[in-house]
A protein has these predicted regions:
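Residue-level signal for inorganic ion chemistry
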Residues: 28, 81, 119, 176, ...
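N-terminal catalytic cores of NTP/NDP-binding nucleotidyl/phosphoryl-transfer enzymes
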Residues: 9-73
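Phosphate/ribose-recognition catalytic cores of enzymes acting on nucleotide-derived substrates
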Residues: 193-241
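Glycine-rich, highly charged phosphate/nucleotide-binding loops
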Residues: 69-77, 100-107
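Short acidic-hydrophobic, aromatic-tinged amphipathic segments that line or gate anion-handling sites
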Residues: 2-9
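Classical nucleotidyltransferase
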Residues: 100-203
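A glycine-rich helix N-cap at a beta->alpha junction
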Residues: 73-90
């Protein structure tokens, strides 16, 4: 999978492409419905398979939220998507200038100029200045076809990144794993702590979790991977184990 960062400069791609588009935080089973549609269309039409996402939350860039936290980091998303056999991952460098683009300018710059022949998006996808663009805007464009994926339900409710964050905040890891379609995972570097656990005979590893959303405070059974080797353990989320 080739990773292409899009910053407004011309990209030399001439092959016809089928691309999903969205933020894809969590890469949950609703998102995977879009990825599977990309695979289906690409196999049928002979297109290259792609996914287009953004490097930052639009609301964060626009100053409407103070913290930028994710269910899956960009590195997580890259690792997960590499397993899906995509040809391209397009990462739009989201800036205030990108946010100010009209829907028509966004389509021209980020879809038509990339030779996207088929767009796959969720039913509630919005884009362009003031979120003025939607699925009907895309469908009105004559240069490509569009697949609109309806909502994916779990227990009668729409699966969304917002719902998963709420479930995670409640510490309901079992339901979260069902919504993700895999086990919840975070990654980070081990950093130096106060060595309290070591002093009482229970050495611990303090992990810098970067900008992840985390479950509520508590103690959780985990499997930790270090250099590819898995270890069963307990994880305390909070201040004093």
């Amino acid at each position: 999978m080739e990773i292409v960062y899009l910053d407004g400069q011309k990209v030399n791609i001439v092959e016809p492409i089928c691309s999903a588009i969205g933020f894809f935080d969590g890469l949950h089973i609703g998102h995977m419905a879009l990825v599977n549609e990309v695979k289906r269309v690409s196999e049928q039409k002979g297109y290259k398979k792609a996914l287009m996402t953004f490097d930052h939350y639009p609301l964060y860039v626009l100053g409407k939220i103070k913290e930028e936290k994710y269910l899956t980091s960009m590195n997580d998303r890259i690792s997960l998507l590499e397993k899906e056999g995509l040809d391209y991952l397009f990462i739009v460098k989201f800036t205030k200038e990108v946010a100010a683009l009209s829907p028509e300018d966004f389509i021209n710059q980020y879809l038509i100029d990339l030779h996207v022949m088929h767009v796959v998006c969720g039913f509630d996808f919005r884009f362009g200045k003031y979120n003025a663009g939607n699925t009907m805007t895309l469908q009105a464009c004559q240069q490509f076809n569009v697949s609109v994926i309806p909502e994916v339900l779990y227990k009668g409710e729409k699966i969304s990144s917002t719902r998963i964050r709420h479930v995670l905040e409640q510490g309901n890891i079992e339901e979260m794993n069902e919504l993700l379609g895999r086990k919840y995972c975070v990654s980070g570097e081990v950093i130096k702590g106060r060595r309290i656990g070591h002093a009482i005979g229970f050495p611990t590893a303090n992990v810098d979790y970067q900008s992840y959303f985390l479950p509520c405070h508590g103690v959780y059974i985990v499997k930790a991977y270090v250099h590819g080797q898995g270890y069963m353990g307990m994880c305390n989320i909070g201040y004093n184990p």
